[in-house]
């Protein structure tokens, strides 16, 4: 669903993203077949907006602990 927070399930080195990074769904394609997802720093700077398949994301679980890491320039 749009504006849901998701977890990336695989590394995307070309975008500077790692499995476990959190993103926000900004657009849903084909009833959940794919998603446009925005990944931002804690300061609000956009790192990437990427099109992902349903297999590349998963919903967050309320018993998970978020983790912070520095972005790679």
Language model features with spans:
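Basic/aromatic-rich interaction segments and small domains that mediate binding to polyanionic partners
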Residues: 2-63
């Amino acid at each position: 669903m749009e504006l849901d927070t998701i977890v990336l399930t695989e590394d995307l080195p070309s975008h500077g993203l790692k499995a476990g990074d959190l993103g926000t769904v900004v657009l849903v394609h084909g009833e959940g077949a794919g998603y446009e997802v925005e990944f931002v720093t804690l300061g609000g700077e956009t790192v990437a907006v990427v099109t992902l398949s349903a297999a590349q994301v998963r919903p967050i679980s309320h018993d998970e602990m978020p983790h912070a890491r520095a972005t790679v320039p």
